[in-house]
Each structure stands twice: as structure tokens, then as C-alpha cells.
UniProtKB/Swiss-Prot annotation:
The keyword Disulfide bond does not apply. It comes from Protochlamydia amoebophila (strain UWE25). The keyword rRNA-binding does not apply. This is tRNA-2-methylthio-N(6)-dimethylallyladenosine synthase. InterPro entries: Elp3/MiaA/NifB-like_rSAM (IPR006638), Methylthiotransferase (IPR005839), Methylthiotransferase_CS (IPR020612), Methylthiotransferase_N (IPR013848), Methylthiotransferase_N_sf (IPR038135), MiaB_methiolase (IPR006463), rSAM (IPR007197), rSAM_horseshoe (IPR023404).
Length: 450
């Protein structure tokens, strides 16, 4: 750790004036970026949304799929051709953990690499780089919830993300998360409740609880006697909190107690992201998903019985190594049967460091893309069916903002995660409104204020 006198500290603070942050990937990365932005603004720096106008550039990266990595590497490579001598470039996020110091070999112009478990070290790393002129790297494996979340610079004024658990212990064979974010670490419930109360006092209406597997919350700290559903009951008592969401769930860990909480708690939205990944038992076993199709469907049936109006989301991967056409058809039939409200569909790409990387990627790319397109087309018909079912219904909408394309309209979401547009002004932003649906456009419902 460096020790600086007052003159050196003054030089360091004068060395950086504006910063730029680009975020790739999931909601966890978005929250991590908000925390880093808060640190930098507390340091006295000004945020710029133009990378050419900043002398500190931070790229918060994603490794979950090959395309995400290639986008980042392409962007960072171009910066090496144009970088000014004063600019400092940092790489944070999952790529930092996955590639570590090899990033310096491929991209010698970057100045620091900061892992997902080290974002609280951002200012210390900047001080080291500025004082020494040398590259710096921190990519610890273990995470402690010691970050000052209360000083995070939120991107939204209505909705906020709150981290409750980090890491994952499931080790699906295709997934880098256990290697980039470490093992599961739950955050103390009193700290979560404190942050949520703080956000509500600032005017936030909706909180989304984040974790790679929120259903594992508290299982690593049984002495707390606070599992995920227990936490939700405590959050429901916070005055002024209108809505609570959560993501993501692992099918193995979702409990009857959680389903009953969704049914009973006024704040908890009736939407569950419930990743299937594949509709073939053999493929699921090869993925190490630790459930069968039959067990998955049992959970879906139980959830729909307890919460009849629940909306389900999912993730599905096509073209996993050795997947046959018949096994793909099993996935296709399940997608058609369950009729997800939201589906994120992907073709498989090998990720370095995962067990699946050792297997031959034997499904040709054109076959992967054909299967993906067939699922996308099916899901489009399901989306159409869902949208038509809303016609004539009156739904509760949390108004989030003016519509970007037509400022005569405002945009909000229903409790089940549907986008809604209707006529209104700034006075409606942040309020709950009843809206009658009369039409739809692509993924958006259209309505009239009641």
C-alpha cells in the first residue's frame, strides 16, 4: 500500500478530472459500475459520457458469452491505436478475473485490471498507477460485503439494484461465473435492510434484489436464521417500498416458502426468472444443472398453482456439445408448452476455464443458428399470444420515465415485467397508475390512463 504526503495527494487529485465508464453484461455489472462511479465522484472527478472527453476510461466487462468478450477486446484494441499519453485505461468485471494479467500481454496500453471482488480498491489502484506509472492488477478470489453501497451513483431515480449474494456454487459446465465471481457469499440482512430503507427515503419505489442465485441466500450463514423468503418478509415491512423483484433463481433452490411469499406479500412482483437452459435430460446432466425436466416441470406446476398469475422468464442455450436434433426438439416442445413471458435465447459458445471447454464443440455453427432462429420464431408467436391476452385489461404500472421517441408518452412496467406506453407527462414519473390496455407494438403494450 502506498503512503502519500499532502503534496503528492494534491498532484494525484489534479491528475484526473473526468472519467468515462462503459458497462457490458448483466445487472450485477450495472450495480458494480454504479458503485465505482460513486467512488470516483466522491474523489472529486466528473463523469463524462464521451470517452474522448475523459482522462480515465473504465470498461466493466462481461465473459458470459464469446460475443461479449469479442466486443470488449475489439474496443480495447482500437483504443491502443488512439490512446493519448495522459489517459488511464482500466478493465474491470468478469474479463478481469477470467484473463487476469494476460490482458496486459494482449493489450499493453491498459493501465490496471480490477476483478469483480476488488471494486472497492478502485481509488487505491488509481493512486498506485498515478504515483508509479506502472500497471496494476487486483483479482482476489474472495469477496467481503464491505462496499459502501449507500454512496453508489444510481443510474435510475425510480428503480434500484441491491446486491444480496455474490458468487455461485453450482458449477454448470458451460458457465464462467463461479470462476469470475467466486463462491457464494451472502450479505448480512441488516445491511440489506439499511440500504433499502435508505433508497426508499431517497424516493425509490422499486428494488431489484440481485444475485447469481438469490435462492441460495443465507444458506452459507445458517446462524443468521434468515433464508431468502425470510428476507423478503422483512423487506415487505419497509414503509414506502412499492415493489420488490429478484433475479436470478436456480430451479433446484426455489422453495415452496418463496412461492408463498410471492403470493402473500404486497410488494413482491409476480415475475420469476426461472432458467431452463435445455429441454433434454441428457443435455441437462451434461450441463450439470442438477435437475431433470420432470423436476423442473414439477416446480413450474407448483408455482402456477400457488401464484396463478405468475409470469415466468427463462434462459435457453442451443447447440451445446453433442446436442442432437431430437434433443433440440425436446427443448422446442418445452418452450411451446410453458409459454414463457420472457425468454433469453442463445447459441452455445465455449468459455475458457469451464469443463465444457474441454469437449469438442461439435454442433456446427450453421446448425446452432438454425436452431436458435427456430426458437426465436416460436417465442415471437408466444409473445404475440401474451400481448393479445392483455387487451382490455387494466393493469398497475409504475411510471419510469418519458418515452424517448415521443415525449407525449410515458413508459412504465407492470408487476409482471411488461412494458407499457400511455399518454402522460413528467408529473406521473415515479407514481403508480392504473392503465387500460388497448393495443400493442412489438414488445410494448399500449394503454390509456384510467
Amino acid at each position: 500500500m502506498f503512503s502519500f504526503n499532502l503534496l503528492t495527494q494534491y498532484i494525484i487529485m489534479r491528475s484526473l478530472k473526468k472519467f468515462f465508464v462503459k458497462t457490458y453484461g448483466c445487472q450485477m455489472n450495472e450495480l458494480d459500475s454504479e458503485i465505482m462511479i460513486g467512488q470516483l465522484e466522491n474523489r472529486g472527478l466528473t463523469r463524462s459520457h464521451d470517452e474522448n472527453d475523459a482522462d480515465l476510461l473504465i470498461f466493466n466487462t462481461c465473459s458470459i458469452r464469446d460475443l461479449a468478450e469479442r466486443k470488449v477486446m475489439g474496443k480495447l484494441g482500437k483504443l491502443g491505436l488512439t490512446k493519448q499519453s495522459q489517459a488511464i485505461i482500466g478493465v474491470t468485471g468478469c474479463m478481469a478475473n477470467a484473463k487476469k494479467d494476460s490482458l496486459f500481454q494482449k493489450l499493453p496500453h491498459i493501465d490496471f485490471v480490477l476483478g469483480t471482488n476488488n471494486i472497492h480498491d478502485l481509488n487505491h489502484v488509481l493512486d498506485e498507477v498515478l504515483a508509479s506509472g506502472k500497471q496494476s492488477i487486483r483479482t482476489d478470489d474472495h469477496f467481503e460485503f464491505e462496499l459502501d453501497y449507500l454512496n453508489a451513483k444510481r443510474e435510475d431515480q425510480i428503480k434500484a439494484y441491491v446486491s444480496i449474494i455474490r458468487g455461485c456454487d453450482k458449477f454448470c459446465t458451460y458457465c464462467v461465473v463461479p470462476y469470475t465471481r467466486g463462491s457464494e457469499v451472502s450479505r448480512a440482512p441488516e445491511n440489506i435492510l439499511e440500504e433499502c430503507r435508505h433508497l426508499v427515503n431517497q424516493g425509490y419505489k422499486e428494488i431489484t434484489l440481485l444475485g447469481q442465485n438469490v435462492n441460495s441466500y443465507g444458506k452459507d450463514k445458517l446462524e443468521w436464521k434468515c433464508l431468502f423468503h425470510d428476507l423478503l418478509y422483512q423487506l415487505d415491512k419497509i414503509p414506502g417500498l412499492e415493489r420488490v423483484r429478484f433475479m436470478t433463481s436456480h430451479p433446484v433452490d426455489i422453495s415452496k416458502e418463496l412461492m408463498e411469499a410471492i403470493r402473500d406479500l404486497k410488494t413482491l412482483c409476480e415475475f420469476v426468472h426461472f432458467p431452463l437452459q435445455a429441454g433434454s435430460n441428457r443435455v441437462l446432466k451434461k450441463m450439470h444443472r442438477i435437475y431433470t425436466v420432470e423436476q423442473y416441470l414439477e416446480k413450474v406446476q407448483m408455482l402456477k398453482e400457488i401464484v396463478p398469475n405468475v409470469a415466468l422468464g427463462t434462459d435457453i442455450i442451443v447447440g451445446f456439445p453433442t446436442e442432437t436434433e431430437e434433443e433440440f426438439q425436446e427443448t422446442y416442445r418445452l418452450l411451446k408448452e410453458i409459454e414463457y413471458s420472457v425468454a433469453f435465447l442463445f447459441s452455445y459458445s465455449p468459455r475458457k476455464g469451464t469443463p465444457a471447454m474441454r469437449w469438442r464443440d461439435d454442433v456446427p455453427e450453421e446448425v446452432k443458428q438454425d436452431r436458435l432462429q427456430r426458437l426465436l420464431q416460436l417465442q415471437d408467436t408466444i409473445y404475440m399470444k401474451h400481448r393479445q391476452a392483455f387487451l382490455g385489461q387494466t393493469v398497475e404500472v409504475l411510471v419510469e420515465r418519458r418515452n424517448f421517441k415521443d415525449d407525449r408518452l410515458v413508459k412504465g412496467r407492470t408487476r409482471c415485467w411488461k412494458n407499457v406506453l400511455f399518454t402522460g407527462g413528467d408529473e406521473l414519473v415515479g407514481t403508480m397508475q392504473q392503465v387500460k390496455i388497448h393495443g400493442y407494438s412489438h414488445q410494448t403494450l399500449l394503454g390509456d390512463l384510467q
